[in-house]
Design a protein with these regions (language model features):
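Extended ligand-binding regions for polar small-molecule ligands
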Residues: 62-71, 137, 143, 148-150, ...
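Ligand-binding clefts/hinges and TM-proximal coupling segments of bilobed small-molecule sensing domains
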Residues: 22-26, 151-168, 201-209, 232-252
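Bacterial lipoprotein signal-peptidase II cleavage site
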Residues: 16-34
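A ligand-binding cleft/hinge motif common to bilobed small-molecule-binding domains
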Residues: 102-110, 155-158, 179, 184-211
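Periplasmic-binding protein-like
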Residues: 44, 119-127, 190, 194-235, ...
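Flexible hinge/capping segments at coil-to-helix
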Residues: 28-32, 127-144
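Short helix-initiation/N-cap motifs at beta->coil->alpha
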Residues: 77-90, 131, 148-151, 166-180, ...
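Extracytoplasmic small-molecule ligand-binding "clamshell" domains
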Residues: 30-101
């Protein structure tokens, strides 16, 4: 009987370990010794703002939210999910905050509160070398690749029609279709576009920008205490020059 109980307990322990290992979150120790977690939802397919190297999360947003977690006296717990799942994770309470190179929009404001902006961006167009597309005016009737749920997706759908949209879970998945002529261009935030072009030959960004915007962090409506603290940290990072240092580290 003792042997049966021992075997059963061993099986329970194994199942528990497997369950723990299947999580799509990553806890980053901020050195504070805190046990309470600060869960931040992101989509780590958006360099230089958030991306992964091995099991480590890196990027501008990650460094900022690490500082926020430290100021809160909590451990940062990164929840890596699809971009269009970030706001639902915040509104449902699955995450404390969303940090995913997210643009402030009136539609998103209906679901979440936004921190003060911490950076600005513009949408950029990526085309193949030798493409006849020279500006936004040339996109009518073209097949446009976008990352699903991003402002590039929203703007292009409004301006050029649902029938011309080709959506990808990450913008890098659109590079090969672009080169093969399956789509005519990609539209994504400027620093991400530059990163994509730097890592892939035969493509370029157009000098003409398309839509200016501001990034901020998404927080559940009514959580004024967290919103105030996040704004305080952003202001401090800006006033001390630390925010500029973080950006310079990732934007060359």
């Amino acid at each position: 009987m003792k042997k049966i109980v021992s075997i059963a307990l061993s099986l329970i322990m194994i199942i528990s370990l497997v369950a723990c290992g299947s999580s799509n979150t990553k806890t980053t120790d901020n050195g504070s010794g805190a046990t309470e977690k600060f869960v931040v939802a992101t989509n780590a397919e958006f360099p230089p703002y958030e991306y992964k190297e091995g099991q480590n999360f890196l990027g501008i947003d990650i460094e900022i939210v690490s500082t926020i977690a430290e100021k809160l006296g909590k451990q940062l717990d990164v929840l890596d999910i699809a971009f269009d799942s970030v706001i639902p994770a915040v509104t449902s309470g699955k995450a404390d905050m969303g940090a995913a190179g997210m643009t402030i929009t009136e539609d998103r404001k209906k679901s979440v509160d936004f921190s003060i902006p911490y950076t600005k961006a513009v949408q950029m167009i990526i085309v193949t070398e030798g493409s006849a597309i020279a500006s936004v005016d040339d996109l009518a009737g073209k097949k446009i690749g976008v990352q699903q749920g991003t402002t590039g997706d929203l703007y292009c759908t409004d301006d050029f029609g649902e029938e011309n949209m080709v959506r990808y879970s990450k913008i890098a998945d659109g590079v090969l279709p672009l080169k093969n002529g399956q789509i005519d261009c990609l539209v994504i935030d400027d620093q991400v576009a530059i990163n994509v072009v730097q890592n892939n030959s035969g493509i370029k960004t157009l000098e003409t920008a398309y839509a200016e915007e501001e990034y901020a962090f998404a927080i559940k409506k009514g959580n004024q205490e967290l919103l105030d603290k996040v704004n305080e940290v952003i202001n401090e990072l800006q006033s001390t020059g630390k925010l500029a240092e973080i950006k310079a580290k990732y934007i060359k």
